[in-house]
Amino acid sequence: MSKLQSEVLKEAISQVVGESKEKGRKFTETVELQIGLKNYDPQKDKRFSGSVKLPHIPRPKMKVCMLGDAQHVEEAEKIGLDYMDVEALKKMNKNKKLVKKLAKKYHAFLASEAIIKQIPRLLGPGLNKAGKFPTLVTHQESLESKVNETKATVKFQLKKVLCMGVAVGNLSMEEKQIQQNIQMSVNFLVSLLKKNWQNVRCLYIKSTMGKPIRVF
């Protein structure tokens, strides 16, 4: 049972949207969900990580890169998706600095079957360390819908601190859509926690430049 009250959430979203309109910011702000946990020891308790696909894409401009075989490179070119082929990956020669730079440049990676197996050998553990190990794309799937699916997916990963933030929407979306995304994100996160809602200390939502508003 979700303890997130939809009225409280609805009111908070209107506040975030209203504040942004008032300030007339020049870019589309992202809406972030900030989570504080309690009764959780990252040293002892299992550090969870999980991904959930949201009903609406939170960040349409999210940068995705295809690590592709010849066929996928061709498809990526057609849809205007950034890509790297095996030769480009070989050139990186496991150089930690270059791999780190690559991981920083993109929010997420996709990879063809033939390439995904070679990633540890070609790039070392860098992408994995950054929490950006590529998602597999087969030739039976449409690359475009895989890109959209990736853009709609948010990842929760507990590291050493008991707070985290994830992008759950943007201010060009309808308030109802932002609400659906937040509800789904929160319910999924709670399902990952050992004691569910008893591990949640607080939840806030905020826009990129706005102030955080507490919803739980």
Swiss-Prot record:
Keyword NAD set for record: no
The record's annotation in InterPro entries points to: eL8/uL1-like, Ribosomal_uL1, Ribosomal_uL1-like, Ribosomal_uL1/biogenesis, Ribosomal_uL1_3-a/b-sand, Ribosomal_uL1_CS
Ribosomal protein as a keyword of this entry, yes or no, is yes
For this UniProt record, the keywords arranged alphabetically read as follows: Ribonucleoprotein, Ribosomal protein
The record's PROSITE patterns line, in alphabetical order, gives: RIBOSOMAL_L1 (PS01199)
Molecular function (Gene Ontology), one example: structural constituent of ribosome
Q: Which GO terms describe its cellular component?
A: cytosolic large ribosomal subunit
Biological process per Gene Ontology, one example term = translation
Provide the assembly information.
Answer: Interacts with the GTPase NUG2.
> Which PANTHER family does the UniProt record give?
RIBOSOMAL PROTEIN L7AE FAMILY MEMBER
Q: What is stated as this protein's family in its record?
A: Belongs to the universal ribosomal protein uL1 family.
Instruction: Please state what the protein is called.
Output: Large ribosomal subunit protein uL1
Q: What organism is recorded for this protein?
A: Oryza sativa subsp. japonica (Rice)
Write the gene name.
Answer: RPL10A
